[in-house]
Amino acid sequence: MANYFNTLTFIEKLKHLGKCRFMSNNEFSNGIQALLSKKVAIIGCGSQGLNQGLNMRDSGVNITYALRRESILNKQESWARATRNGFPVGTYDEIIPKSDVVINLTPDKCHTSVIRQIEPLMKHGSTLGYSHGFHIVEVGEKIRQDITVIMVAPKCPGTEVRQEYQRGFGVPALIAVHEENDTYDMGMTLAKSWAFALGSHRAGVLESSFVAEVKSDLMGEQTILCGMLQAGSILCFDYMISNGVNAAYAGKFIQCGWEVITEALKQGGITLMMDRLSNASKIRAFILSEKLKNILKPVFEKHMENILNGVFSKEMMLDWENNDSKLLKWREKTSQLPLEQAPNYQQEILEQTYFDYGILMVAIIKSGIELSFDTMIKSGIAPESAYYESLHELPLIANTIARKKLYEMNMVISDTAEYGNYLFCDKVVPLLKKTIIPNLRTGDLGMSPKNVNVDNIVLRNTNDMIRNHTIEKVGIQLRSYMQNMKSLSFN
């Protein structure tokens, strides 16, 4: 099999990368109708598998789990999750031949093996669903022509897919039909019903392509969504400790600070996040952000280049063949970080304190979002896709860190995201330790900032540059469709 993206012509690549259309609410007026009469099987009961199944069942879809025979016989975790939640469970041989729609929500590394087992069992004219296009685009799997291939990709980990649904809202999603596999012209109808069943129609759905989803998703998760949060957590915690801050307090400040600060992004983008700072702190955060962008721009661009040309995927798949040697080494290294070992801090930290004492964290968030967004746009990815992958999903990832630090984030994101996160951190942490950390001022993190005079012209220009960035203009439009988005309360 050959990387699908690399087989396309230059013009075809641009067409696939740029495919993006925001779908109106009335396009989902039929709800789950297209799935009501269908037997839907989900393969895999991990974070995405379980939580998508719960949402779909609550929306009225008939869901069954198809699991490996060994998983059922040995009562492994996937079997336990499905049965504990009252779902019917069966083997591939028992479930797949009867299913109209088969949704493959196993890890990327398992897809080739899974498809080899289930494709001969799938009935003529059935549908195969994915929530990430890696297997189609990067591995280059060719699916039987009579099978319709669709994708609904929620823009967050599975845990947040469920939590946002239970709040009466949902998470944005990209949906797509693989144009090589839509013989009956039914793919989009089924994808819309699936997205509706997840609750994504309440948050915003983009009609996209498998290519655009994969390339933007890989870029977002490697850089701002996971990579910058992990690198920032390591750097900020170590800096606070080196300045005499209590380890328990520093641990809670970092662990919960990302969630508190990024919650402002959901309601008002970078502008609102920066407005939570004092005028002097806003100017300082802006200056730090610009320095970070100048230093990190080549790193972001190299990651995008390796995602587009397939180098990243090739290297990661080699690690799969080596029994995840690199991934497991990085995972163990992360578990031993001083931040992960820090004792719990029992006292409350007020919401505003995270902004007042977290100027560096705000700068890290701002720079990472803008760099990720700008790099994607330059590569041909549509602004709306880039927004979801760089800004909107960030608070949902930060929520996972607030639960159990970096361990929780890395457990609920995919192995693909986790691998890319570690790859990014290995470059960025030493780079910023040499360039940014030695030049921080008292008050940039963990301590009260100094009182300084504010120049009106500088403040005006700073506000203009924040508000006129393209991501802020795109964000205003996309957030206008999220009228029922639920806010988190911290104090």
UniProtKB/Swiss-Prot annotation:
What does UniProt list as catalytic?
H132
The UniProt record gives the binding positions of NADP(+) as C45, G46, S47, Q48, R68, S78, G158
> Where does the KARI C-terminal knotted domain start and stop, copy by copy?
209-344, 345-485
The keyword Isomerase belongs to this UniProt entry's keyword annotation: no
Q: Which PROSITE patterns match?
A: KARI_C, KARI_N
- Which UniProt keywords are listed? Amino-acid biosynthesis, Branched-chain amino acid biosynthesis, Magnesium, Metal-binding, NADP, Oxidoreductase, Repeat
Which reaction does this enzyme catalyse, per its entry?
A: (2R)-2,3-dihydroxy-3-methylbutanoate + NADP(+) = (2S)-2-acetolactate + NADPH + H(+); (2R,3R)-2,3-dihydroxy-3-methylpentanoate + NADP(+) = (S)-2-ethyl-2-hydroxy-3-oxobutanoate + NADPH + H(+)
Q: Which residues of this UniProt protein bind substrate?
A: S414
Q: What does the entry give for GO biological process?
A: isoleucine biosynthetic process; L-valine biosynthetic process
Q: rRNA-binding among the record's keywords?
A: no
Q: Which cofactor does it need?
A: Mg(2+)
The intrachain disulfides are none
- Pfam families registered for this protein in UniProt: KARI_C, KARI_N
What Gene Ontology terms describe where this protein resides (cellular component)? cytosol
Question: Pathway involvement?
Answer: Amino-acid biosynthesis; L-isoleucine biosynthesis; L-isoleucine from 2-oxobutanoate: step 2/4; Amino-acid biosynthesis; L-valine biosynthesis; L-valine from pyruvate: step 2/4
Described function: Involved in the biosynthesis of branched-chain amino acids (BCAA). Catalyzes an alkyl-migration followed by a ketol-acid reduction of (S)-2-acetolactate (S2AL) to yield (R)-2,3-dihydroxy-isovalerate. In the isomerase reaction, S2AL is rearranged via a Mg-dependent methyl migration to produce 3-hydroxy-3-methyl-2-ketobutyrate (HMKB). In the reductase reaction, this 2-ketoacid undergoes a metal-dependent reduction by NADPH to yield (R)-2,3-dihydroxy-isovalerate.
The record's listing under PANTHER family reads:
KETOL-ACID REDUCTOISOMERASE, MITOCHONDRIAL
What is the protein name for this chain?
A: Ketol-acid reductoisomerase (NADP(+))
Which species does the entry assign this protein to? Blochmanniella pennsylvanica (strain BPEN)
Q: Which gene encodes it?
A: ilvC
